[in-house]
């Protein structure tokens, strides 16, 4: 499978079985992270930003006080690709 190829439903289901806390929604994968405070949430966001820059692939990030929601998809390809799974593994690694 080429990096830009959209994942098939069974590939997404298999990946979700190995990605704790992630859910599929509207052609993307989403996870909510909770932290003790805003500072902890922002430290996490900065770490995600570093990983995303290194990968050249960036999630949507929403911060609400101590809660961070990440949404990962490959907009250019119109859905989920291996790049998304790879980024999630780096974030959760």
Could you tell me what each predicted segment is?
Residues 46-47, 89:
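Solvent-exposed alpha-helix faces
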Residues 1-36:
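N-terminal first-folded block
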Residues 39-45:
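Short amphipathic alpha-helices within nucleic acid-binding modules
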Residues 26, 63-67:
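Short Gly/Ser/Thr- and Asp/Glu-enriched loop/turn motifs at secondary-structure junctions
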Residues 31-39, 68-75:
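Alpha-helical scaffold segments that form or flank carboxylate-/histidine-based iron centers
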Residues 21-24, 49-59:
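Short arginine-rich
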Residues 67-93:
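C-terminal structural segments of small proteins and small subunits
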């Amino acid at each position: 499978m080429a990096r830009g190829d959209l994942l098939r439903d069974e590939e997404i289901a298999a990946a979700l079985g190995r990605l704790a806390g992630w859910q599929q929604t509207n052609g993307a994968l989403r996870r909510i992270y909770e932290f003790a405070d805003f500072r902890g949430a922002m430290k996490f966001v900065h770490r995600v930003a570093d990983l995303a820059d290194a990968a050249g692939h960036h999630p949507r990030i929403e911060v609400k006080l101590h809660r961070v929601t990440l949404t990962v998809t490959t907009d250019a390809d119109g859905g989920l690709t291996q790049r998304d799974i790879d980024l999630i593994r780096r974030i959760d690694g």
